[in-house]
Amino acid sequence: MAKPERNKKPQQAEERDDGMREKMVAVNRVTKVVKGGRILGFAALTVVGDGDGSIGMGKGKSREVPVAVQKAMEEARRKMAKVSLKSGTVHHTVMGRHGATTVMIQPAPEGTGIIAGGAMRAVFEVVGVTNVVAKAHGSTNPYNIVRATIDGLSKVNTPAEIAAKRGLSVDQIQG
């Protein structure tokens, strides 16, 4: 079986006039078996972000690919969530889980870039993370990876939040 052809240049997230970055993660051909035969359709997975810490994931199904993608984009815009970032990276190492997928996300110094695979890369690009190291363990299903990545990003706490929980000052936390 031949390997799928890969793009040499990284794909940039498509930016709309409202300032949102959109990225299509996966499109699957699906079939529904009925008495008269098979009905072909498409399922799309997309992520939308503002490049400043907001992220949304959407799924859409339809008989045609463009309609499925449009439905997924609309759902992603409705399900936006805010995550805490620190100058293009995360504050600390976090683990995200969904189903059989575990994702480890680590902060990285300036100039590192996004070192992450497929579906995780799309999430980081639209959310506004520019320097990060991430690794997925377990299932590599794009749906699970996107959900686990968003789960991990939602667990990131700022130093101020950690200091408030511990009853200390931010200076004491950062040592």
Swiss-Prot record:
Keywords: Ribonucleoprotein, Ribosomal protein, RNA-binding, rRNA-binding. Pfam families: Ribosomal_S5, Ribosomal_S5_C. Residues 1-21 are annotated as: Disordered. One of its GO terms (cellular component) is small ribosomal subunit. Residues 20-83 form the S5 DRBM domain. SUPFAM superfamilies: dsRNA-binding domain-like (SSF54768), Ribosomal protein S5 domain 2-like (SSF54211). GO terms for molecular function: rRNA binding; structural constituent of ribosome. GO terms for biological process: translation. Part of the 30S ribosomal subunit. Contacts proteins S4 and S8. With S4 and S12 plays an important role in translational accuracy. Located at the back of the 30S subunit body where it stabilizes the conformation of the head with respect to the body. Belongs to the universal ribosomal protein uS5 family. PANTHER family: MITOCHONDRIAL RIBOSOMAL PROTEIN S5. The N-terminal domain interacts with the head of the 30S subunit; the C-terminal domain interacts with the body and contacts protein S4. The interaction surface between S4 and S5 is involved in control of translational fidelity. This is Small ribosomal subunit protein uS5. It comes from Dechloromonas aromatica (strain RCB). The gene is rpsE.
